[in-house]
Amino acid sequence: MTASAYLDLLDELLRPGIAGLSAPLVDAQVRFVAGCQRPDGGFGGRQGGSDPYYTDFALRVLTWLAPAHEAFSRTAAYLAGRSLPPRDVVECFSLLSTRRLLERQRVGQDKGTVPFSASPAETTDENWDSPQAVLPGQLGFRTLATLSAPALDPLRLTEWLYGRLLPSGGFARTADDPRVSAYHTFLGALCFQMLGVEMPAVEDAVRAVQALRRPDGGYAELAGQSASQTNATAAALGFLTMHDGMLAENMAPAARFFAQMQSADGGLKPHAAVRGGDLLSTFTGLLTLWGLDARQQIDAAAVARFLRGAAHPGGGFLACDADDAADVEYTYYGVGTLALLRLWSTAP
C-alpha cells in the first residue's frame, strides 16, 4: 500500500459521513478555519505565525468542506516559499501532505470537478447524542479555480529522510534521542511513500515498532516507556498494517486497550493516567477500531455527547469541553470524528 493510497483510503472511508454534514455546521467550520489563515497564506495554531503543521490540518478540513475555497491558492504561495530541509519528520510529512492536497485540487480542476466535497444536508445539529441524526446526506462536486501545487525537491527530501533513519530501524523524535518513536516512524513511512521511494530496512522498523507493544495490548510511544498510549497505539498499528507486520493475535488485545481508554465523558483518553478524553485520542482510537473491525467495543452515543461538548459555538472544535480555545488541528479531529460516527450508525 502506498502512502497516497493510505491517505486516499482514509478520505474515501470518511466521505459518506462528511457528505451529510448540515449546511450551518459546514459554514461554521469553514469560516473558522479560513479565519485562521495568516497573511502569508499559511495557517497557524492558537498563537504565532504560519506553520506547516497547522497548514496541513487546515487544508484537510477545507478539502472536505470547501474544496473551491480561495484559501488554497494563497496556501500554494506560502508552500512555494518554504525553505528546506524540514525541521523534523512531522514537518516533512506536513509539507508533503499539503502538497498532495494542493495537487488534488489541481487535478480536480483539470477534470472540471473537485475530488472531495461536502454536500450539506437539510438537517439540524441539535441531537448529537444520536450519530445517525447528525450525519445523513450524500456527496456532491463543485468546479474549482485553477491551482498549481508547488514543487518540493523529492531528492533532497529523500536524502534528508535517509539521514534521519535509526540504525535499528524507524525514526526517533529528535536527533538527540536514539529511541524509536511509533508516531514518527509512521509519519516517516508515509513520507517515503508519498515520495514514491521504498522505505529502507522496513523489516527492522517493523521489529522495532512491534517491540513497543505492552501487556495491555497497546503500544508505547518510545522504547523504555512502560505505559501504552492511545495515539502511539494508533500510529503503531497503522505502520504495522501498511507493512504486513500486524499479527492477528494482537488485534483483539489492541481493540480491548482502546475500549479501556473510553472515559466517563465519552471521549478516549491519551493514556490510562488521564481522567478525561480528548478529540485527538478519540479520533485516532475510533479510526483504528474501525480498521480492527471492533466497533462494538465503543459506546458511540457517549462519543457523540463528548463531541458536542467539544464543539465551539462559533465554529471549530476544542480538545475537550474543558479547553478554552478552538484550533484547526482539533477541528480536523472533530469533523473526522463526526464522519466516523456516521459510519458507526450505518454499519451492519
What role is predicted for each listed range?
Residues 25-41, 70-87, 106-130, 151-171, ...:
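Long, well-ordered core segments of solenoidal/helical folds
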Residues 2-22, 46-69, 84-109, 128-156, ...:
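An alpha-helical repeat/solenoid feature that recognizes helix-turn-helix modules
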